[in-house]
């Protein structure tokens, strides 16, 4: 049975400032660096063999810190990027106009084909993150990969594995540097395919972590 660990990046400057990141970027805070080191300490005990990361800066840095702890190489995969939030990226969430807030709500509340102008839909996000996960099935027997990605992207992935719509990710609380695990099982008795073993574990962190845009 293949076990895949899913890690959200460490806290960033824009997380702390309540700014919308999407595929734009901001650096890890000192707290975010510490969170990544604590993930690394946990990862060292898990037998991780591969690290696959979104190619955005905040995930790259998180993956680098984890890789130093567990001695793994990193592969970068753009399919693990965060949801493209279009024209709302870099904006402070409390400064959105009524129209802009409506765009955001339509997207995250599951409106069919909802998207922010110049951004992507939840279905497009779901398609690419699930394809990235499926690539883990091509790794050598005995592999145990760890994927470093983003809050909405990982929430979407876990939701769809559970058979829920992609926008159900808003019902999952995946805090900065939380660890989730999904397994691929082939069984005559259990549901074949991907199953969720754990989601949003923060027991390795020594201080409270942020949810998406939450203080």
Swiss-Prot record:
GO terms for biological process: glycolytic process. GO terms for cellular component: cytoplasm. Keywords: Glycolysis, Isomerase. Substrate binds at residues 8-15, 21-22, 58, 60, 82-85, 104-105, 151-152. One of its GO terms (molecular function) is phosphatase activity. Pathway: Carbohydrate degradation; glycolysis; pyruvate from D-glyceraldehyde 3-phosphate: step 3/5. PROSITE patterns: PG_MUTASE. It comes from the Bacteria. The record marks 150 as: Transition state stabilizer. Belongs to the phosphoglycerate mutase family. GpmB subfamily. This is Probable phosphoglycerate mutase GpmB. The gene is gpmB.
């Amino acid at each position: 049975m293949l076990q895949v660990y899913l890690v959200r990046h460490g806290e960033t400057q824009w997380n702390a400032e309540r700014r919308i990141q999407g595929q734009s970027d901001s650096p890890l805070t000192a707290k975010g660096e510490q969170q990544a080191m604590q993930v690394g300490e946990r990862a060292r005990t898990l037998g991780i063999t591969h690290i696959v990361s979104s190619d955005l800066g905040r995930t790259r840095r998180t993956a680098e810190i984890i890789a130093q702890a567990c001695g793994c190489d990193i592969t970068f995969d753009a399919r693990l990027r965060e949801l493209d939030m279009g024209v709302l990226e870099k904006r402070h969430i409390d400064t959105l106009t009524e129209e802009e807030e409506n765009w955001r709500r339509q997207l995250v509340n599951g409106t069919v084909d909802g998207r922010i102008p110049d951004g992507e839909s939840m279905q497009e996000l779901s398609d690419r993150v699930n394809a990235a996960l499926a690539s883990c099935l091509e790794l050598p027997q005995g592999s145990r990969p760890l994927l470093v990605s983003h809050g909405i992207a990982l929430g979407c992935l876990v939701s769809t594995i559970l058979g829920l719509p992609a926008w159900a990710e808003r019902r999952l609380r995946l805090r900065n540097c939380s660890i989730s695990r999904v397994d691929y099982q082939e069984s005559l008795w259990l549901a074949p395919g991907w199953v969720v073993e754990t989601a949003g574990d923060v027991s390795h962190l020594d201080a409270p972590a942020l949810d998406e845009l939450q203080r």
